[in-house]
């Protein structure tokens, strides 16, 4: 259990540009009535504050586990049972302060949950519905090497885990936790990536963005976790921030306001939004950069830190920055953005996405 990550409580949303940032005011939307996607964008800080207090009261201090970009965390049974999927480490840990039946139920529901996070409240204590098309199918196998795709297999696997893999640990508050650890298969990331290939192919054709770039960004942003949410309220597979990139995207779609969480938790809408934002970076904010490789490096860095921050690495004046970029070869642009960008996160981000993109170069 030492591998468990402890996530700090999010009592307020941190108001700064993170993943999928934007630098300019949005344009006015159409005067025609548009769907209202922004109803549930407020009050998240209150929700998270109450969530944190609930966990502290039941599990004790320093035991808060919270959903993040590459970690799915879901509490059930009035917060006495929880499941944690690390999509980065390829490991599932399901634990309870209640009885074995609660643990069995959580094992089954976790293994058979769907891929669409729309309408799923990760901060409530209810079970995620069982899906006929489980998201983890092909990523987890049972004791016989079978993919867990239905209730019968999941229940049989749960029985095996409870009889052979059950462990306990003691909390600082004196309570005993019972848990099981389920490893994912070695190529679990690749399996998840394949699930989204039809959508990525569709958005690539729609916006003229290379599939490998979309997939590389998805891997680095969320490890293909459709339930992803960051401390800066970036949401979904491509980690779109509603109030920045989301506003830019909606303005260009002719919508007012910004997308809400349910909109961005829909995989199709999220990949559409993230890919559209890449075109905004390419065609608007970074317009004028002539070399396609240099522009790609700038787009990747800007997706994380914002176009303004990228251009200021070269000059405070936008036109002068673009001129300087055009006077340098792509290798120099890469070196500068990975060494001179003031944000260490942005420096590392370009390295990671560029590396991840190479894996998907031959995907069509």
UniProtKB/Swiss-Prot annotation:
Belongs to the transglycosylase Slt family. SUPFAM superfamilies: Lysozyme-like. Residues 1-19 form the signal peptide. One of its GO terms (molecular function) is peptidoglycan lytic transglycosylase activity. Keywords: Cell outer membrane, Cell wall biogenesis/degradation, Lipoprotein, Lyase, Membrane, Palmitate, Signal. Its main location: membrane. It catalyses: Exolytic cleavage of the (1->4)-beta-glycosidic linkage between N-acetylmuramic acid (MurNAc) and N-acetylglucosamine (GlcNAc) residues in peptidoglycan, from either the reducing or the non-reducing ends of the peptidoglycan chains, with concomitant formation of a 1,6-anhydrobond in the MurNAc residue. Murein-degrading enzyme. May play a role in recycling of muropeptides during cell elongation and/or cell division. Transmembrane segments: none annotated. This is Membrane-bound lytic murein transglycosylase C. A lipid is attached at residue 20 (N-palmitoyl cysteine). InterPro entries: Lysozyme-like_dom_sf (IPR023346), Murein_transglycosylaseC (IPR023664), Murein_transglycosylaseC_N (IPR024570), Transglyc_AS (IPR000189), Transglycosylase_SLT_dom_1 (IPR008258). It is a lipid-anchor. Its EC number is 4.2.2.n1. One of its GO terms (biological process) is cell wall macromolecule catabolic process. It is found in: Cell outer membrane. It is an enzyme of class 4 (lyase). It comes from the Bacteria. Gene3D superfamilies: 1.10.530.10. One of its GO terms (cellular component) is cell outer membrane. PROSITE patterns: PROKAR_LIPOPROTEIN (PS51257), TRANSGLYCOSYLASE (PS00922). A lipid is attached at residue 20 (S-diacylglycerol cysteine). The keyword Phosphoprotein does not apply.
């Amino acid at each position: 259990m030492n591998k468990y990550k402890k996530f700090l409580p999010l009592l307020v949303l941190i108001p700064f540009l993170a993943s999928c940032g934007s630098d300019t005011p949005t344009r006015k939307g159409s005067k025609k009535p548009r769907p209202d996607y922004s109803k549930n964008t407020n009050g998240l800080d209150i929700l998270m504050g109450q969530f944190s207090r609930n966990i502290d009261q039941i599990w004790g201090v320093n035991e808060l586990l919270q959903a993040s970009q590459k970690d799915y965390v879901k509490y059930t049974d009035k917060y006495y049972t929880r499941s944690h999927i690390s999509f980065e480490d390829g490991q599932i840990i399901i634990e309870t302060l209640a009885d074995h039946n609660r643990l069995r139920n959580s094992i089954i529901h976790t293994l058979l949950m769907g891929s669409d996070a729309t309408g799923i409240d990760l901060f409530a204590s209810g079970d995620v519905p069982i899906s006929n098309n489980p998201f983890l199918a092909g990523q987890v196998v049972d004791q016989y090497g079978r993919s867990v795709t239905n209730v019968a297999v999941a229940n049989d696997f749960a029985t095996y885990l409870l009889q052979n893999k059950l462990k306990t640990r003691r909390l600082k508050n004196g309570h005993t936790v019972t848990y099981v650890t389920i490893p994912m298969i070695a190529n679990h990331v690749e399996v998840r990536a394949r699930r989204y290939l039809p959508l990525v192919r569709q958005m690539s054709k729609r916006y003229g963005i290379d599939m490998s770039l979309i997939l590389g960004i998805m891997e680095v942003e969320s490890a293909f976790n459709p339930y992803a949410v960051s401390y800066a309220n970036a949401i979904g597979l491509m980690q779109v921030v509603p109030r920045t990139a989301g506003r830019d995207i909606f303005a260009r779609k002719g919508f007012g306001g910004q997308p809400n969480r349910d909109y961005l938790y829909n995989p199709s809408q999220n990949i559409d939004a993230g890919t559209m934002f890449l075109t905004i970076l390419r065609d608007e904010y970074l317009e004028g950069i002539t070399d396609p490789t240099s522009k790609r490096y700038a787009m990747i860095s800007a997706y994380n830190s914002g176009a303004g921050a990228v251009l200021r690495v070269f000059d405070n004046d936008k036109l002068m920055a673009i001129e300087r970029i055009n006077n340098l070869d792509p290798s120099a642009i890469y070196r500068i953005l990975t060494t001179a960008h003031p944000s260490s996160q942005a420096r590392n981000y370009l390295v990671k996405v560029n590396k991840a993109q190479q894996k998907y170069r031959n995907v069509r």
